UniProtKB/Swiss-Prot annotation:
Gene that encodes it: vma6
Membrane topology: Peripheral membrane protein
One Gene Ontology cellular component: fungal-type vacuole membrane
PANTHER family with a match to the protein in the record: VACUOLAR ATP SYNTHASE SUBUNIT AC39 (PTHR11028)
Domain of life the protein comes from: Eukaryota
Pfam families given in the database record: vATP-synt_AC39
Keywords from the UniProt entry: Hydrogen ion transport, Ion transport, Membrane, Transport, Vacuole
Protein known as: V-type proton ATPase subunit d
Native species: Schizosaccharomyces pombe (strain 972 / ATCC 24843)
Family recorded in the similarity comment: Belongs to the V-ATPase V0D/AC39 subunit family.
Principal subcellular localization: membrane
UniProt GO molecular function: ATP hydrolysis activity; proton-transporting ATPase activity, rotational mechanism
């Protein structure tokens, strides 16, 4: 899509999202928040930011309430963008929600298998991944029933074709389903962004390639010490990314963390994640890299990638706020700045 037609169809949305991005909290705000002695002080500090009085009607504050209210703000922003979207952006935003749908499905299946309360599970589902038949997941007893009764009418149905050979819904099979769904979803989203082309592809393909690589690394590490075979593991790797296909073939044969490090050594940024002298965890490195890639999306104009990037940056901001609030509650303010700053 050329710049003129993009501006005609989506210029307002791009300006709106860039306005949201410019209001993300800066480092000095986090520093001020980390010095708060109570959550009341925390509320007061946030009142001078774009969050304004979003906690004004909360008589009792907890980190969970702060997270929930901040997420409500994000949902309102996402909904406003979606209401203004043209057909292509609307489909792009649908793809964004599919990841939350998968997460909700896995949350309900895992919780049901472990005997958790259905009502509590449904309350924990992410609103962006809600669909009409979601509550029926709690009574599914096998994968065929899960597909034919609950998911066949959802956008995720095509992703399930490689899951239908699974047996009963035990914890290991649920993990296999999760990773198989994500593989199909990421490959589909990647191809959709390639089809859009132009700056949307330029910004989104590196982001999705990183996500594919992160999943391949995580799947490998989490499979150690389980009954998952190397062949089954390899089938769950997305078929794109900077690690694909050479490094993923090494990951498929990996037997320990050292093998994973060797597989990632050909990609400089990833090899740094395994620096033994670093005090950061692998997840810390992943989160920092994700923020870096999403910030880069705002350096280009006339593309849909900033919608995805803003959502991910706002989610990291919410995690930062929740962490600081929890540190204040637990009287561990010395740990409050163990976050991933954005601006």
């Amino acid at each position: 899509m050329d710049a003129l037609s993009f501006n005609t169809n989506s210029g307002y949305i791009e300006a709106l999202v860039r306005g949201y991005e410019s209001a993300l909290l800066e480092q000095h705000i986090y520093s001020n928040l980390s010095q708060c002695e109570s959550l009341e002080d925390f509320r007061l500090q946030l009142s001078s930011t774009d969050y304004g009085g979003f906690l004004a009607n909360q008589s009792k504050l907890t980190s969970s309430i702060i997270s929930a209210k901040a997420t409500e703000k994000l949902l309102d922003e996402f909904d406003l963008i979606r209401r203004q979207a043209d057909e292509t952006l609307s489909k792009f935003m649908d793809y964004i929600t599919y990841a939350y749908m998968i997460d909700n499905i896995m949350l309900l299946l895992t919780g049901t298998v472990n005997g958790q309360d259905t009502h509590d599970l449904l309350e924990r589902c992410h609103p962006l991944g809600w669909f009409e038949t979601l509550p029926a997941l709690c009574v599914a007893t096998n994968v065929e029933e899960l597909y034919s009764v609950v998911l066949i009418e959802t956008p995720l149905a095509p992703y399930f074709k490689d899951c239908l050979s699974a047996d009963d819904l035990d914890e290991q099979h649920i993990e296999i389903i999760r990773n198989t769904l994500y593989k199909a979803y990421l490959e589909d989203f990647y191809n959709f962004c390639k089809k859009i082309g132009a700056c949307t592809a330029d910004t989104m393909l590196p982001i999705l390639e990183f996500e594919a690589d992160r999943r391949a690394i995580t799947i490998t590490i989490n499979s150690f010490g389980t009954e998952l075979s190397k062949e089954e593991r390899a089938k769950m790797y997305p078929s794109f990314g900077r690690l694909y296909p050479f490094s993923t073939s090494i990951l498929a044969r990996a037997e320990n963390a050292g093998d994973v490090e060797n597989a990632c050594s050909l990609v400089k940024e990833y090899s740094d994640f395994f620096d033994q002298n670093s005090q950061k965890s692998l997840d810390d490195h992943f989160n920092e890299k994700e923020v870096e890639l999403n910030k880069l999306a705002f350096l280009q104009q006339f593309h849909y990638g900033i919608v995805y990037a803003f959502l991910k940056l706002r989610e990291q901001e919410i995690r930062n706020l929740t962490w600081i609030a929890e540190c204040i509650s637990q009287n561990q303010r010395d740990r409050a700045l163990n976050i991933v700053p954005i601006l």
